[in-house]
Every structure is written in structure tokens, then in C-alpha cells.
């Protein structure tokens, strides 16, 4: 797992929905600073937030974490 990959994915999907960091923060009941840290690859979202985050971004947790790409690369 790569925090920068996940952060870039969150940013990409957020922007594709024309959402701000504040929008994501409000949906997940976290601070804007937390979302900023995720997007910059400084932290991962808390495990309890992975599923709700993936649901609002309309992506699987595996895709959000880059796990599907890793398994494809290993084949």
C-alpha cells in the first residue's frame, strides 16, 4: 500500500465530482486537515473510514488502496 497513491486517487476522484476537501470532510465527519493529509500522502484514512470513503467516491476499497493494481502487476 502506498499513501501517495491513495492520496492521489482521493484527490482525482474528489475533483472529478467537483467536491472540495470540506465536502469530503463533512460527509465523513472528519476535519479538512485530515482530508488534506490523506491527499498529500502523509496519512491513510482510519480503517473505520475506508469503506464509507470508498462508497462516497464510488470505488472499491481495493482500488482506493491500489491493491487491484498490485495483484495485476504480480501476475
Regions found by a protein language model. Give the residues of each.
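A short, Lys/Arg-rich alpha-helix, primarily the initiator
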Residues: 1-16
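Short coil turns linking two alpha-helices in DNA-binding domains
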Residues: 2, 20, 31-34, 46, ...
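Short alpha-helical DNA-recognition segment
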Residues: 18-37, 52
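Short, conserved catalytic or interaction motifs in soluble domains
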Residues: 30, 40, 69
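DNA major-groove recognition helix of helix-turn-helix/homeodomain DNA-binding modules
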Residues: 48-63
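Short, charged recognition helix plus adjacent turn
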Residues: 66-75
Amino acid at each position: 500500500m502506498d499513501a501517495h497513491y491513495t492520496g492521489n486517487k482521493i484527490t482525482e476522484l474528489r475533483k472529478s465530482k467537483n467536491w472540495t476537501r470540506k465536502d469530503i470532510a463533512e460527509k465523513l465527519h472528519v476535519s479538512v486537515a485530515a482530508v488534506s493529509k490523506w491527499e498529500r500522502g502523509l496519512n491513510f484514512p482510519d480503517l473505520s473510514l475506508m469503506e464509507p470513503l470508498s462508497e462516497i467516491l464510488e470505488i472499491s476499497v481495493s482500488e482506493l488502496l491500489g491493491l487491484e493494481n498490485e495483484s495485476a502487476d504480480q501476475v
